[in-house]
Swiss-Prot record:
Belongs to the RTT106 family. It is found in: Nucleus; Chromosome. Residues 361-386 have a biased composition (Acidic residues). Histones H3 and H4 chaperone involved in the nucleosome formation and heterochromatin silencing. Required for the deposition of H3K56ac-carrying H3-H4 complex onto newly-replicated DNA. Plays a role in the transcriptional regulation of the cell-cycle dependent histone genes by creating a repressive structure at the core histone gene promoter. Residues 394-409 have a biased composition (Basic and acidic residues). It comes from Candida albicans (strain SC5314 / ATCC MYA-2876) (Yeast). This is Histone chaperone RTT106. Residues 344-409 are annotated as: Disordered. One of its GO terms (cellular component) is chromosome. Its main location: nucleus. One of its GO terms (molecular function) is histone binding. The keyword Hydrolase does not apply.
Length: 409
């Protein structure tokens, strides 16, 4: 056990490895393989704080300039797809880049393996407003929690992206004259659709499958089956059932959005709670059963019991949901084949299964286990500022804040 990497470990870890290897000499091969994977694997996150270098312009594949990030950093940055050298070969990378010096603050490589979920999402309240309908969220969740526990979440205005693309020569200057769109049209206009299609194709070339849930009636055939200030149901690719449901709700005292995603060719069905900390993300297959409670004439609660990676059952309550949206939520649950335990609980009066109840009080952000992790101090702020310019972001970009992303496995 004379490998150089072992000698670089703290004495306590060296002793632990030595004790295991003394019992089974063959076990060192597993340690050695683990070290090789962690130091040379394809799923990497690089914090460039030693000698950060500017991204050479000729290596940039695609860039979205100066958009508002809420996670894992909180300021205006560039989102850049570019090429880096790995093992002597060019490989696509995704970086969050400081626009003042074009130096990445965070870089992911091996994108086909690194990115688990990439979503373009509408924002509740904006879809019914013709002035804000083009403002959306772009989100990335990573496979390896050791590499990134925070999702990449940014908010962008497709109209501002259009102006930037015209300025950079990605779109013709006279593109506005090629299309006529009524001012009060709620679906996106043809130019915005083409921008999204361009995003999707560029990400796909780099190994990222972006799922678009914005209303695009021509290219993507995405249409609203429900469009309310407090709820959205989106049918994609001309399907008869919604692929996306978003509903305002509360988890304890915290207001947020419950997001239900149907399975597609790329991803399994997911349930997400955002956008304030902590963000919950889990696959629908992890749900053991659901039930409804606190039912009144106007609102109800959805209780979801999931199995985490410790094989513990966790009960999550999403409350204060408008009764108007019961059917669209219940239809999603039935399509997933999830058992509705509402009547079983009423008849039994108590649970025969031991369930870990998640604290729904205001201090539930302080929970520290595999599913809920505490935030860094100072991250929960009311207004985001550009750290370089010390200016508040535009008012239309302050609709909601994404915080730490927690996945239940």
């Amino acid at each position: 056990m004379d490998s150089a990497w072992v000698q670089q470990l703290p004495p306590e870890l060296q002793n632990d490895i030595k004790a295991v290897v003394e019992k089974d000499q063959s076990s060192f091969a597993a340690f050695d393989n683990l070290h090789a994977f962690l130091t040379g694997g394809t799923t990497k996150k690089r914090k460039l704080n030693a000698e950060p270098e500017e991204i050479p312009p000729e290596t940039i594949i695609f860039e979205i300039n100066e958009i508002s990030f809420y996670s894992p950093v909180r300021k205006r940055m560039n989102l850049t797809l570019h090429l880096v050298e790995e093992d002597g070969n060019p490989s696509p990378a995704l970086s969050i880049v400081n626009p003042s010096n074009n130096i990445p603050e965070l870089t992911f490589t091996g994108l086909d393996q690194a990115v688990k979920l990439c979503l373009l999402l509408p924002i509740l309240g904006n879809t019914t407003n013709t002035q804000k309908k083009a403002i959306c969220y772009l989100c990335f969740w990573m496979h390896d929690e050791n590499m990134s526990k925070d999702p990449i979440v940014c908010q962008m205005n497709l109209d501002l992206v259009k102006k930037s693309m015209i300025k950079n020569g990605k779109l013709p200057a006279d593109i506005e004259s090629k299309f006529i769109t009524p001012r009060d049209a709620l679906p996106l206009n043809p130019i915005q659709e083409r921008i999204i299609d361009y995003f999707k194709r560029q990400f796909q070339l780099c190994g990222i499958s972006m799922m678009n849930y914005m209303p695009c009636v021509s290219i993507f055939r995405n249409t609203f089956s429900l469009n309310d200030d407090n709820a959205i149901a989106m049918n994609t690719d001309g399907a008869s059932q919604p692929a996306l449901v978003m509903v305002n709700c509360h988890k304890g005292a915290k207001e947020g959005v419950l997001i239900l995603l149907q399975a597609n060719k790329t991803n399994p069905a997911h349930i997400i709670f955002g956008f304030k900390k902590p963000i919950l993300v889990f696959e629908a297959s992890q749900v053991l059963h659901t039930s409804y409670s606190n039912i009144t004439r106007q609102t109800f609660s959805l209780n979801v019991v999931v199995l985490n990676k410790k094989q513990e059952q966790r009960e999550l309550e999403f409350g204060m949901i408008d009764e108007k949206f019961y059917k669209v939520i219940d239809d999603f649950i039935k399509l997933q084949g999830i058992n509705d335990a509402t009547f079983n609980q009423e008849e039994s009066g108590d649970d025969s299964i031991e369930i870990v109840h998640v604290n729904n009080n205001d201090d539930d952000d302080d929970e520290e286990d595999d599913d809920f992790q505490s935030e860094d101090s100072g991250s929960d702020v009311e207004e985001e500022y550009n750290s370089d310019l010390n200016e508040p972001l535009a008012a239309h970009e302050e609709d909601g804040v994404f915080e730490r992303g927690i996945e239940i496995e």
